[in-house]
């Protein structure tokens, strides 16, 4: 990257997640909400990817032969199960500590993931391209959302997909995803999310459309305390996911 160029990296966020790196794979630790969230996002990714690429979602390895980027992969909570679906996965994160934890866990689990301590900009500048880009629970932690989305979009191959998951910038989200989750329920460490860094759907859709991608699906996600599970929902006021495709 040239000197003075814009960057998507918020070093404070990188440092904060690096400090918690040892907790990534603890289902009762600081990343417990992501462990709970994983089944619904994995199901969404599998089903939409199979629909796009003409695969059977019930097969053992439905993503066989597809190249997938998990940007901001953290400790690999998403990278590993996607690799188990047959995909060739690149897990990228700017934190060396996160990548170290992810690599160690994958090796111990017998899962092949290409983990790299790199930024989205570095991958794009190297000309890397993917059938699927996973941009999950990352945009609310970057320094420049528009640049980050544009950079990720560049790496989506013709006919390929980008999945985005984040938290909406609404008062409802401030009350539930920040105040309640961090201060009352203690699901997350205080300071995990800042209201001003939350992202509205249109702020993601605009740079994706400007990059030549078409928004093909939107869904909310909510936590059902009775079933203790996350479910897809029409309500996008708090957690939501977007799907966009680059025309073939």
UniProtKB/Swiss-Prot annotation:
<keyword id="KW-0831">Ubiquinone biosynthesis</keyword>
<dbReference type="GO" id="GO:0032259">
    <property type="term" value="P:methylation"/>
</dbReference>
<keyword id="KW-0808">Transferase</keyword>
<dbReference type="GO" id="GO:0010420">
    <property type="term" value="F:polyprenyldihydroxybenzoate methyltransferase activity"/>
</dbReference>
<dbReference type="Pfam" id="PF13489">
    <property type="entry name" value="Methyltransf_23"/>
</dbReference>
<comment type="similarity">
    <text>Belongs to the methyltransferase superfamily. UbiG/COQ3 family.</text>
</comment>
<keyword id="KW-0489">Methyltransferase</keyword>
<feature type="binding site">
    <location>
        <position position="72"/>
    </location>
    <ligand>
        <name>S-adenosyl-L-methionine</name>
    </ligand>
</feature>
<dbReference type="GO" id="GO:0102208">
    <property type="term" value="F:2-polyprenyl-6-hydroxyphenol methylase activity"/>
</dbReference>
<dbReference type="GO" id="GO:0061542">
    <property type="term" value="F:3-demethylubiquinol 3-O-methyltransferase activity"/>
</dbReference>
<feature type="binding site">
    <location>
        <position position="136"/>
    </location>
    <ligand>
        <name>S-adenosyl-L-methionine</name>
    </ligand>
</feature>
<feature type="binding site">
    <location>
        <position position="93"/>
    </location>
    <ligand>
        <name>S-adenosyl-L-methionine</name>
    </ligand>
</feature>
<dbReference type="InterPro" id="IPR010233">
    <property type="entry name" value="UbiG_MeTrfase"/>
</dbReference>
<comment type="pathway">
    <text>Cofactor biosynthesis; ubiquinone biosynthesis.</text>
</comment>
<keyword id="KW-0949">S-adenosyl-L-methionine</keyword>
<dbReference type="InterPro" id="IPR029063">
    <property type="entry name" value="SAM-dependent_MTases_sf"/>
</dbReference>
<comment type="function">
    <text>O-methyltransferase that catalyzes the 2 O-methylation steps in the ubiquinone biosynthetic pathway.</text>
</comment>
<protein>
    <recommendedName>
        <fullName>Ubiquinone biosynthesis O-methyltransferase</fullName>
        <ecNumber>2.1.1.222</ecNumber>
        <ecNumber>2.1.1.64</ecNumber>
    </recommendedName>
</protein>
<feature type="binding site">
    <location>
        <position position="41"/>
    </location>
    <ligand>
        <name>S-adenosyl-L-methionine</name>
    </ligand>
</feature>
């Amino acid at each position: 990257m040239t000197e003075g160029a814009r960057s998507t990296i918020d070093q404070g966020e990188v440092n904060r997640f690096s400090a918690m790196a040892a907790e990534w794979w603890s289902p009762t630790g600081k990343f417990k909400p992501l462990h709970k969230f994983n089944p619904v996002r994995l199901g969404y990714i599998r089903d939409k990817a199979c629909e796009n690429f003409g695969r059977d979602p019930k097969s053992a390895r439905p993503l066989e032969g597809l190249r997938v980027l998990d940007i901001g992969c953290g400790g690999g909570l998403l990278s590993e199960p996607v690799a188990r679906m047959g995909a060739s996965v690149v897990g990228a994160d700017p934190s060396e500590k996160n990548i170290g934890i992810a690599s160690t866990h994958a090796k111990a689990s017998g899962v092949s993931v290409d983990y790299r301590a790199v930024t989205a900009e570095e991958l794009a500048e190297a000309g890397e391209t993917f059938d699927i880009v996973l941009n999950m629970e990352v945009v609310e932690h970057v320094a420049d959302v528009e640049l980050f989305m544009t950079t990720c979009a560049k790496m989506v191959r013709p006919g390929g997909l980008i999945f985005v998951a984040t938290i909406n910038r609404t008062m409802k989200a401030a009350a539930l995803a920040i105040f309640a989750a961090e201060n009352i329920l203690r699901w997350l460490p205080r300071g995990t999310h800042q209201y001003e860094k939350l992202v509205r759907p249109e702020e993601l859709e605009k740079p994706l459309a400007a990059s030549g991608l078409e928004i093909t699906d939107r869904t909310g996600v909510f936590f059902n305390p009775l079933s203790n599970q996350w479910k897809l929902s029409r309500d996008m006021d708090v957690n939501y996911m977007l799907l966009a495709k680059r025309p073939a």
